Amino acid sequence: MNKKHSSPAQKKISQQVVFQRRINASKNIEQASNVCFSVLAKSMRKDSFTEFLYMFRNFLDLPVAKNIMNYRYKGDTIDIFNIKTMPFEMLEIRDVVKWLTEIFGYFSEDLNDFVKAKVAITNNILLADFEGAKRNLEKFIDDHGVCNWTIATELSLLYFQGKITEYKDKIKEFTHIEDGLSQSFLTYEGIRCNPSVTSERYRFSIGKMIEEVRIDNQPQLEETIKYRHDFSPCDVYSNMDFIFSNTCEKRIFDMYNSFKRFIFYKYNDGSDISEIVTCVEKLTNSIHDSEIEIFYKRISGTESDIKDEQYNEVIDNYINNNYERVITQSEKILLEKPYFSVIYLPYIKSLVRKKQNTSLPGPIGEIIRLSCNLFSNIEFEDSLKKLSKIYYVLLHNDWVHIIGCILDNFDGSDGINNPKRYNYVDSLLLINNKLSFRDSTNFKWLDDENISAWRRDKIKADKYFYDGEYGKALNLYSNSLDKSEKNYIEELKAKIIYCHFSLGEISVAITILSELLSKGANPRTLPINTVAEYVAKEGHYKTNNDELYNEAIILNAYNKNIIAKYIQHTSNVCENFLENIDVTDKNQITFENESIPAFFLTELLSIDVLEGMTSIIESEVDVLLTRLNIDRYIVTNEEKFDSKTVRKSKNEITNIFYKLIVQACSNEAGEGRIYVDKSSLKAKLINDVERELEILRGSDNKELNTYVELTDDHGIEYHTMSTPFMRDVFDLMMKVSDGYTIDKLYGIDQSLNVGIRHGGIVNLLWAPLKNNGIAALKSKDSKFIPNPVWRNDFGYYNKGFLDSIDKNLVLLNEKLNTIINDAKEKVHINTGEFIESAKVFNYAIEIEFVEEMAGSIDKIDGDTFIELIFNYLDEKTNDCLDYAKNNFIPKLRHEMIDAIQNTRNEIKIENINRAISQSKIQLEESIEFLQSWFNWSGTSKTPFALKAAIEKSRLILSKLHPWLEINFSGSLNTQKIFLGKHFTPIVTLLTLIFENVVKHGANRDSTEIIVDINENNDVIELSFVNKVQEPFNQDELEKFSRINEILDTEYETYSARETGSGIFKIKKILSLELKCKNHVHIHPTENSFGITIGIYDNGGMFE
């Protein structure tokens, strides 16, 4: 007997009975929801989608379903992702969309409320009606509950209001969420809107999370993180269907937002979405959302009741250069719809052309003002930082990607991805954008003669550019250069560069880009990213120096303005350039060499770049002396250079002078190379610190509140200051900390830079291989190649055997090169932009110390404030040095020795193995020496006589002035022996004295210094006199007299900024570094210059 099939009505009753029984047996709404969706999930797994959807509709028809659906998809708690999702992996994406459409239809009334509230609240926030935004948001939450959108909107509202206390309270709630995904997601939402976290820091936090999943080899999670926390229409999500379906089920309003973002992205990406057209149409019948209605009209091609009249009117006026009318219309529209971002750019560019300020209020006014600043190059860096922050604060809104377009214009890409962002926003705000090259195929309206010729040509060229017809675009761009408005010229030149590059005319693109950069163009407005990457990756040995010079200029601009990624590539290009003009020695690198452009010397040959030029620059001292000679020429001939270049060279001379002293003293005064010029820093900071402390002391509210912003995977807490007073105290502390760590002249990073990173780590670790003949050669493309000496010494072996030797030794060189470069990159300061394990020197100020300093503001002066922070950071540095010696160096030793040992095991020739073994022994010694560098400089325990310090100073001067003979008359012997720890400061002050002699000496080829030493029980007095080249006039003598008068009281202030005799620096060394009672007096005559210094024994000077 055949089995009878149930009718649809019978099946509906049967299924509803099952659901009702399960619901009746449940103790509460949570259990009822779980059992009902368990039944639905089972059907989704085993039945066809049609059967599952039929069952779902039958469930929704139950009267009790409303409570269950509200419980599942709406809620008052902030654990917004605490939901056991349906098994969407069983469904095709079209079926997921169909199911979501059913959900949205069921909640249509709620979603209509949501659409209205979203528009109203967005308007309130952007137009600075913050109280209205708060009321509307609270009402919506009261009526419909909490979701990610309400939380993100509240955080953005608090950001624009500047309400830190309320923001703190909101963030505190996240720490108590038990659901892990909800807590993680909302934590990053909090960081995104945190007033004290920059956009760069937010991106870093996202990058850190991505780095962790990348290590675990989970590429799909990597894209999911980007999609959730840093979505961009320009990004490629290789499995968008998976990302969306895997995250689509959540609170109903978030589901709806996520669905819209998904379909807009798919449409914008060019994917086939024909299967979901009917679903979108169904939504338009029940949900009155202009974005969905516009999108449906786009994908269905049907006529629309919605017109783009407002937009078209603005654009018509814009392309006809009627900028005043554009401004008037735009402001009227934006006061009604401030989120109507498709008119931001014509409005902004019209303001720029008319040199007007926006009249719009609140955040929308700030967005426009900052954008105008960027296009006008006014307060550029600050405006870029602030606009980027606003972009991230508003990132939960899809219209915000127009701000992303603006930012893309200034990231070195020339906004190449902008069409994707424009198209994405067009998809939700416009039926048809007449300027969109995706939407419009007919540009007959351009034939209107009222439109200026240059404008018509530019739009046509942009169309060709969009379509990839770069040849046609190039012709039109080039023809428009002389006709366009001034404001468009730079944009046209950027497009011309990209066209040449895309047509394979690489050398032309490089030449044009280099010329623009040389003339001062902003690299961020040009396609420097693309060209610099090509130069770095495809660059090779050349004989054409014009091409090399252009490449070096581009790499230099990229390194300094985008990211310092291609330093070694710049070194290679510069070295190639110099070799082509037969410069093989550092002494040939001079301004007198007419084959070397002045810009090449002033800007390109930085210390970083010189350090990488290993064929010409042989040692760490050569690096410094080469740059020193360049700087000296600039300062001596300052009338030939701009003030910025001269000022930079003066500062660099001071820095190099000290570094040479540190290196020269390393044997006698210990090998330590870590140094902070605290006294100079204090003089530089003291005025600002005193002024800001005075303001802090007058604060009405000195509440010492902080709160935990987030806790990382290792349990480390990140705090944020919760009151204006605490934030201001912390900012002032960070100003001092930044000086200590990263000040370019006096901070600790300078000692890492010149003393270790670019002061010999590479040469030190390579020396053992070079000394024993197992170092490979480098090709002109900087690739390792076999050293011919290997075959010369062992040529009696067969070819296969020798090939094996070549292969293994080249691999060893490559491996060691990677290890050495990785180690070099770790010797950096980390002030928060890296994960802690990535760098050796990590500085983070603990919250307890901030609170301690904040509580002492009324009791301490500026000098004490700075000293307390310096002492705190000294302890941090000691910890870093311990880490370097006990972790970093042992790991480096293990990796290098292991690589050498593995190579030895592969090679069967005894003589080579002996060379490898000898290299291993010497490498151990080199690493031991490197370890000694990670100590404070000038910390030797070996006592010394004054004569030894004088001889060391003479040696340093011979390096600084190799042509000069320095003679001393008088006895250099003393009875008193100085403690070893004072060696470097004593040598420094002697060198300052002798350098002054050289400057004013009577003879250019030789000079004589008359030395007189007097010793008593508790003091040693040193007098140095020399004849001068030119007699001092009366004004100069009065200046010296004035110096004697103020020397004891104002040496700190003047030592930080003087560039003359160095007398104040000498006094500073005696008082602050040696910390001894002293006297300093200068006694010039008409034909001589003398200085006397007295050093008193305070119990810690002499042996």
UniProtKB/Swiss-Prot annotation:
Keywords for this protein: Antiviral defense, Phosphoprotein, TPR repeat, Transferase, Two-component regulatory system
Gene this chain is encoded by: dtcA
Protein source organism: Enterobacter cloacae (strain JD6301)
Post-translational modification: Autophosphorylated.
Reported function: Sensor-kinase member of the two-component regulatory system Detocs that confers resistance to bacteriophage. When the system (DtcA-DtcB-DtcC) is expressed in a susceptible E.coli (strain MG1655) it confers resistance to bacteriophages T2, T4, T5, T7, SECphi4, SECphi6 and SECphi27; the level of resistance varies, resistance to T2, T7 and SECphi4 is not very high.
Enzyme Commission number(s): 2.7.13.3
Reactions accelerated catalytically: ATP + protein L-histidine = ADP + protein N-phospho-L-histidine
The protein's name in its UniProt record: Detocs histidine-protein kinase DtcA
Claim: Transport is one of the keywords in the record: no
UniProt key word Transferase: yes
GO MF, any single term: transferase activity
Per-repeat ranges for TPR: 818-851
GO BP terms, alphabetized: defense response to virus; phosphorelay signal transduction system
Phosphohistidine: modified positions: H758
